[in-house]
């Protein structure tokens, strides 16, 4: 039985050429497109128009930074043990982007790609993209993202469904819920949506690691957690 040919449609290169998604990298892309637009090209196979670019970049910017989150702490702790391997520390932080943090964008996009019937969606015990421990009753990131969506003509049925779910459940529509809906408005494959968060948060983690190198806090976190967590086990003085 003949083997299936190995095939990739993303890019090719020769001695003097590099072509990405049909675009000449040095001649058409370098110096002409921003990182968000390049990501859009990689994901969809085409460059975004001006309005798509504005919205997609807004989505990515939203997920770059959110303080000392579990992903940032994981990256810093890994960097403490292996300061020579920034890539390992970034990878450690990215590994925590799942169904609870950042990666919930994927759950929202998958859910909405299957149906926008709010009554049907309400049958789910848990709806991704709703609720936030800090930002309530309104997530300011969601408000701004939907403003950009309206300004670019991308506020549609997916956004409306999430806002209605938020209202009916009386839970904050968080930024990942908004981004999952907006990814659907842009026609993105739901399987790529978590990747937008991974791409964005990688940038933020590099910032955390540079700060850790200049202004370390990981050792202090470790020592204080160790002291508090085991305090009840130690003999009283």
Regions found by a protein language model. Give the residues of each.
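Non-transmembrane, aqueous-exposed alpha-helical and coiled segments at domain scale
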Residues: 1-237
């Amino acid at each position: 039985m003949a083997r299936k040919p190995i095939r990739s449609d993303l890019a090719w290169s020769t001695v003097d050429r590099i072509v990405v998604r049909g675009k000449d990298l040095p001649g058409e892309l370098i110096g002409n497109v921003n990182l968000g637009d390049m990501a859009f090209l990689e994901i969809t196979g085409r460059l975004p128009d001006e309005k798509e670019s504005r919205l997609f970049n807004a989505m990515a910017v939203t997920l770059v930074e959110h303080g000392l989150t579990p992903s940032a702490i994981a990256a810093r702790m890994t960097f403490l043990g292996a300061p020579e391997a920034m890539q390992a520390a970034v990878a450690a932080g990215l590994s925590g982007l799942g169904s609870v943090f950042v990666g919930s964008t994927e759950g929202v996009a998958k859910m909405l790609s299957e149906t926008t019937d709010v009554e049907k969606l309400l049958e789910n015990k848990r709806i991704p993209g709703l609720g936030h421990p800090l930002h309530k009753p309104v997530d300011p990131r969601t408000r701004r993202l939907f403003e950009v969506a309206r300004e670019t003509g991308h506020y549609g049925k997916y956004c409306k469904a999430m806002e209605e779910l938020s209202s009916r459940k009386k839970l904050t529509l968080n930024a990942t819920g908004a981004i999952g809906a907006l990814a659907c408005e842009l026609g993105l494959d739901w399987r790529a949506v978590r990747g937008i968060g991974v791409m964005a948060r990688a940038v933020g983690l590099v910032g955390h690691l540079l700060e850790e190198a200049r202004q370390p806090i990981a050792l202090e976190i470790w020592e204080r957690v160790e002291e508090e967590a085991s305090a009840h086990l130690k003999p009283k003085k």
